[in-house]
Amino acid sequence: MRLSVCLLMVSLALCCYQAHALVCPAVASEITVFLFLSDAAVNLQVAKLNPPPEALAAKLEVKHCTDQISFKKRLSLKKSWWK
């Protein structure tokens, strides 16, 4: 699963890259919800895409891991790509 998350991040970086190197607002919103909001908010956001249950379960599993990161470090992650 770690490889799939890495591949997803690389894919998003390549697909959403713009000449001025700003993060695509949709990606920024997705990552912000993922890092800072509850499981219910993530469920609502992912439900728009109608994913298979396994994909949703995998995303929530990764979210539970990222929830272990301190708030301060998650905030610094956000600041590094949201300028």
From Swiss-Prot:
Primary subcellular site in the record, as a coarse category? secreted
Q: Where in the cell is it found?
A: Secreted
What this chain does, per the entry, is described as: Seems to be involved in the regulation of chemotactic cell migration and invasion.
Similarity comment: Belongs to the secretoglobin family. Lipophilin subfamily.
Q: Which InterPro entries match?
A: Secretoglobin, Secretoglobin_sf
Q: Where is the signal peptide?
A: 1-21
Q: Which UniProt keywords apply?
A: Secreted, Signal
Tissues where the protein occurs: Expressed in all tissues; the highest level of expression is detectable in lymph nodes, tonsil, cultured lymphoblasts and ovary.
One GO CC annotation, please?
A: extracellular space
- Upper lineage: Eukaryota, Metazoa, Chordata, Craniata, Vertebrata
Q: What is this protein called?
A: Secretoglobin family 1D member 4
